[in-house]
Every structure is written in structure tokens, then in C-alpha cells.
């Protein structure tokens, strides 16, 4: 079964690129034609690249990796949050903090601070002994941290790969990923640079429906990767426990059925000896 169909890509407007005056010449090979001053992306290539990105994400997650979803532009914010939360992956959909990857130790401290403030806010006497002004300042600090960091609250280490919507807008995230040799999977619109992406998906990174559809594809890959990982872990646990493999069962059953046949001649021989 196909990951996504040509009809779905067309309906979501994935084929619409930018105006011809706003393009990156490096994207020439992904462009099918030009229509009314707009570049049309070759969706046949998009389908091929989607399959490659899907398999990479699936295998990464199957081997215990995490995918960080990144998209801070308005058109991408909802899709990034919805799809990342659906499969339990971290996400950034408001603002990328410089050093979020390259200075993760400092970011971890800010995450710890956010959780402290959340615990304080949840406790009945969390603000006891503080003035209204102090309480207001702490509340503002918590809200500010949550806005930027809530999507990565459970991210204890740098991710295995990034899914990015609009590499131009998220150029800092792309640069940090490259510095740490973290693979980047991203939508490539006609104004993007394909050289900065490891697993490109040529398509429209401005339309809400397009970003939602492609983010759904990536989250589905994560979902399948998790299933594959669970199956591997279960198989390993069974092997460690010494349980027979399912394919061994028929052989054992066959051996049991054949056993009486081997004993029959022996019984007949005993009867013959007794008669003699």
C-alpha cells in the first residue's frame, strides 16, 4: 500500500511552488513546469522521495531513535504539534531557541526550571509566602518557558533526526543539526536549498493542507517504526526466555505423531519372541 497517493498530494496542493521570481536554481531538477508565474513541482519525484524519507524515519525509530518535529511558521504550527503529540515525539512550533541542539545542556536546565514552576503552580500552597508581584512574575516566567519549551519537555537527549517545515525559516535549526551530524528530513519548496537536507521531500511548505499531509506521513512512519521496535523487543525477550520459535512448533508436532510408528515394530518383535 502506498504511503500517500498522487491524488492526495494534488488535493492538498503539494505541487504548488513559489512565484518564478522567487526560486532557488538548485531546485530546478524538482520542477515539472511553470504555470501563470508559479512553479509546479514534479509530484512523481515527490512520491519517490516520500518513500525514502518514510523508510528512513521508520528505521530510525525502530532502532530507538527520536524525531524532532520543527515548524514555527503559522501554517505549520498546528500540524507539527498535532502529529508529534499523536506519536509521542518532541516538537518546536513557536520559536527555535539558538543552541537548542548545540547547547542542549543549558536548554535542559531551562526545562528543569519550567518543571519546577509547573509543580509550584500545581501545588495548593505553591505560592504561599510570596507577594502578588512575585507570584505574577513567576507565572509569567512559567508561561514564557512553556510557550517555547513545552514541546520538548520530555526530550532528555538530542534527537536522532529532524523533520522540518520551511528550511529557510528554520535555518538555525538546520545549521545546528549539521554541526552535530543530525540528519534533516524536510519539505523543499522551490525557494529552498536542497543541499542542506539529507532526506528532501519536494513540495509546498506554505499551504496548511500540504504541511498537514506531509507531517502526517512522517508521524505514520514514526508509528510504524515504534511497532517494529516493539516486535523486535518481544522477539528478543522470547529468545532470551528460551521459548521455541513459532516455526519450530509444526516440526515438534510431526515428531510426536511419528513416534508411535517407530515403536510399533519393537512391540511386534516382542510378541514374536514371546511366541517362540
From Swiss-Prot:
This is Small ribosomal subunit protein uS2. PROSITE patterns: RIBOSOMAL_S2_1 (PS00962). GO terms for cellular component: cytosolic small ribosomal subunit. HAMAP family: Ribosomal_uS2_B. Belongs to the universal ribosomal protein uS2 family. It comes from Corynebacterium efficiens (strain DSM 44549 / YS-314 / AJ 12310 / JCM 11189 / NBRC 100395). The keyword Ribonucleoprotein applies. Residues 251-276 have a biased composition (Low complexity). Residues 226-276 are annotated as: Disordered. One of its GO terms (molecular function) is structural constituent of ribosome. NCBIfam families: rpsB_bact (TIGR01011). One of its GO terms (biological process) is translation.
